[in-house]
């Protein structure tokens, strides 16, 4: 479990983790990168993972993924890919390239922090300094200097959901009313997503609203609204912010 970057639970209670020991990039001429997508499972229900399965290996910087009935959507810059397990043995059999053209020259700003909305579409964050141009059946889609993508698998439609003065957005979450919130890792700030999502001409940034949650320290490495019975009643609906450098913990906001 080297250099984990994103995790997600499936509907069987198993924890999927993307690991990127090749970060920030592999050395030309050295061995090819072997980043992985792992499945951790508690088979005897003692609260500890006792089984590890390598769902996919020989990857390069899978810094974002999203589980879906048809497979696992995955970052493999410059591509958005789909890992498919044809025989349901918990090992990917195929990797399909769905979209091409996501910028690659700053690996920790590339499409990441995947999060699905209630409709089944999912969001991908992209940081500053990148200039992506992706060909789609609906025409080219572009994102410049930081933004949030939305991909709808049912329509095979990619769109720029938000483009504003972001540094490195790394966290998308939805509240009880399905409103979107966007967190910026570099600055540690948190923004209400809806006012930033209006369709604007390419290259025009949308001004931000006031911060949704107070900044304590940077950077933000994940956010979520509590809606699980694993947490007590008094925690339900609270906004959780994970910090990976400042105070090295998780803050709760009601």
Regions found by a protein language model. Give the residues of each.
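Beta-propeller domains with acidic blade repeats across secreted/periplasmic ectodomains
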Residues: 1-254
